[in-house]
From Swiss-Prot:
HAMAP family: Glu_tRNA_reductase. InterPro entries: 4pyrrol_synth_GluRdtase, 4pyrrol_synth_GluRdtase_dimer, 4pyrrol_synth_GluRdtase_N, GluRdtase_CS, GluRdtase_dimer_dom_sf, GluRdtase_N_sf, NAD(P)-bd_dom_sf, Shikm_DH/Glu-tRNA_Rdtase. NADP(+) binds at residues 188-193. Its EC number is 1.2.1.70. This is Glutamyl-tRNA reductase. Catalyzes the NADPH-dependent reduction of glutamyl-tRNA(Glu) to glutamate 1-semialdehyde (GSA). One of its GO terms (biological process) is protoporphyrinogen IX biosynthetic process from glutamate. The gene is hemA. The active site is at 50 (nucleophile). The lineage of its organism: Bacteria, Pseudomonadati, Pseudomonadota, Gammaproteobacteria, Thiotrichales. Possesses an unusual extended V-shaped dimeric structure with each monomer consisting of three distinct domains arranged along a curved 'spinal' alpha-helix. The N-terminal catalytic domain specifically recognizes the glutamate moiety of the substrate. The second domain is the NADPH-binding domain, and the third C-terminal domain is responsible for dimerization. SUPFAM superfamilies: Glutamyl tRNA-reductase catalytic, N-terminal domain (SSF69742), Glutamyl tRNA-reductase dimerization domain (SSF69075), NAD(P)-binding Rossmann-fold domains (SSF51735). It comes from Francisella tularensis subsp. tularensis (strain WY96-3418).
């Protein structure tokens, strides 16, 4: 079984590309059913956030990568975007190292951001719910979560108040000096939307409107604040008229706010959704200011220096954690092989022993039977090692011959 991952992220792909290849907003159960239906795909975990879409897989044949790319391409709306031009393939240990760094926030646009760990955990949970995760992949994710927990407790990488949500609010503050007199509309009440809401409430705006598909979730977030209100997405045309700042963090497959919704009133539009929820053409109107996820980079760069030292400490923890994981996996593989070896030997002995005992019970010469039994066991036990040594010799594999000699306690110098 091989471990691989296929990824499209902000490092190689701009927002319009990431939007096309995003798997968020689609039916999760359908996604898992379809990917597990591909021959040689054994287990899978799908992660889709605003900055990346990644698929982690246990496969039985590396040639299946082409089939997975075809599967992914099938969800792309614009045929001009070809996944082979953008994806990154990782294999084996590289997958585990990347996932550890990712969960610790070291691969994020915002170095050390804590939200990614929750997103990775959510993806893992959905995979388990859809019976898509196996023992090996499960062990990988459990070690990843333990590593992230250790990094958070032993470093200060997550202590600076920096996230995509925080950076979005920073951009809004740069455009509007006095937010206390402004109305803010947040679209989406998911994890990022809730984080946006917290940052906005700290600025004490005149009014906060939170719109979501299900109003119950929005109500739960806004209920403790007198200047906050919960709304359905269907109310967006009316809400936009009132708003000075519109921030979107929602999973949609097409723009839900376009130029037809806005008049001449100056507004700040910030879209951190993938795929994009706010039409970029909003920024072409003279009175508006428009930002997308990629524009947040400038804000993030200002905060990177504060976290670089903590990042190096986190890297050391990750390297150590990976070494621990690999050692444990070696032991698991070794123990499994040893168990199988003993089971094989038991099968050989049991069959020959039963035949020998039956002959003795029938009055045959016990000494002769025991000698014959010992000879048969020796022959059966050594059959496959002898075949293997002959094959290794034919292929000039002296390393295999040395290994086999050591296994049987033979002199490796001869």
């Amino acid at each position: 079984m091989a471990l691989i991952s296929l990824a499209i992220d902000y490092k190689k792909s701009p927002i319009e590309v990431r939007s096309e290849f995003a798997l968020s907003g689609l039916d999760v159960s359908m996604l898992y059913r379809s990917i597990l239906a591909i021959d040689n795909v054994v287990h899978a975990v799908i992660l889709s956030t605003c900055n990346r879409t990644e698929v982690y897989l246990e496969i039985s044949d590396l040639r299946v990568v082409d089939d997975i790319l075809v599967w992914w391409q099938g969800y792309v709306r614009n045929p001009n975007y070809k996944i082979k031009d953008y994806f990154k393939l990782r294999q084996g240990t590289e997958v585990i190292m990347h996932l550890m760094k990712l969960a610790c926030g070291l691969e994020s646009m915002v170095l050390g951001e804590p939200q990614i760990l929750g997103q990775v955990k959510d993806s893992y949970t959905l995979s388990k719910k859809n019976h898509a995760i196996g023992k090996e992949l499960d062990r990988v994710f459990q070690k990843v979560f333990a590593t992230a927990k250790r990094v958070r407790s032993e470093t200060r990488i997550g202590h600076c108040p920096v996230s995509v949500a925080f950076s979005a609010i920073t951009l809004a503050k740069r455009q509007l000096d006095n937010i206390s007199s402004k109305n803010v509309l947040i679209i989406g009440a998911g994890q990022t939307g809730e984080l946006l809401f917290r940052h906005v409430t700290a600025l004490a705006p005149k009014q906060i409107m939170l719109a979501n598909r299900t109003i119950e979730k929005a109500q739960k977030i806004t209920s403790a604040f007198r200047n906050a209100s919960a709304h359905y997405l269907s109310e967006l045309p009316q809400l936009i008229k009132k708003a000075d700042i519109i921030i979107a963090a929602v999973n949609v497959l097409e723009y839900i706010v376009t130029c037809k919704y806005v008049g001449d009133k100056p507004r700040v539009f910030i879209d951190i959704s993938i795929p994009q929820a706010l039409d970029p053409k909003l920024g072409e109107l003279e009175q508006n200011v428009y930002y997308c996820v990629d524009d947040i980079n400038a804000v993030i760069e200002d905060n990177k220096d504060k976290r670089k030292y903590e990042s190096s400490k986190a890297q050391k923890i990750i390297v150590k954690s990976l070494e621990e994981y690999l050692e444990k996996e070696k032991a698991i593989i070794s123990n499994s092989a040893i168990k199988e070896l003993f089971q094989k030997a038991d099968g050989l002995v049991d069959l020959s022993l039963e035949k020998s005992l039956a002959k003795i019970r029938n009055g045959k010469d016990a000494e002769e039977i025991i000698k014959r039994f010992a000879y048969e066991i020796k022959k059966k036990v050594l059959h496959y090692p002898v075949v293997g040594m002959k094959e290794a010799s034919k292929q000039g594999r002296s390393d295999c011959l040395v290994c086999m000699k050591r296994m049987f306690g033979l002199n490796v110098e001869k």
